[in-house]
Amino acid sequence: MKLEEKVKELLSPILEDRGLKLVDIEYITGKRPVLRIYIYNPEGTSIDDCEYVSQRIGSILDVEDLIKTSYTLEVSSPGLDRKFKNIEEYNIFKGKDVVVKTKEPIEDKKIFKGILEGLEDGIVKLKQDNIVVEIPLDKISQTKLDF
C-alpha cells in the first residue's frame, strides 16, 4: 500500500471526529521529505482544525513509523488559488463558487463561473443564474474555487 493511501486510512477517523474532509495528500521526497495534508471544513477550515489533525496524525505516524526518515508534516486548507487535483473535490466543494475552464468551447464559452452542484456520471453540474450547466469532466482543463 502506498504511503498516501495508508495515511488516508489513518486520517479517516480523525477527520470524521471533527466533520472534516480530506482534500489531498502529497508526499514530497528529497533531502528533507514533506508530508502535506489538505483538509476542508464546510463551515470554514480553521487553524484549530489544522492543529487538531496535525497533532493526532503526527502521533499516529510516529507510532506506525511509516516514514523511516525525519520529515516535515504540514496540515492546511487547500488555499484560495488551488486547482482541483482529483474528482472527489467536485463533491467535497459542492455548493461553493467555482471557475471551470474547458479545453474547447462549449456553447461558445471556455470559462464558466457558478455554484458547483457536484459530479455525477462524468458530468460536472454548475449552477449559473438559476440554470444548471452540464460540463463533461473530460472536457475540463481546470477547476478552482472562486473567492
Curated annotation (Swiss-Prot):
InterPro entries: Ribosome_maturation_RimP, RimP_C, RimP_C_sf, RimP_N, RimP_N_sf. It is found in: Cytoplasm. Pfam families: DUF150_C, RimP_N. Transmembrane segments: none annotated. SUPFAM superfamilies: YhbC-like, C-terminal domain, YhbC-like, N-terminal domain. It comes from the Bacteria. One of its GO terms (cellular component) is cytosol. Keywords: Cytoplasm, Ribosome biogenesis. GO terms for biological process: ribosomal small subunit assembly; translation. The keyword Cytoplasm applies. Belongs to the RimP family. Required for maturation of 30S ribosomal subunits. PANTHER family: RIBOSOME MATURATION FACTOR RIMP (PTHR33867:SF1). This is Ribosome maturation factor RimP. The gene is rimP.
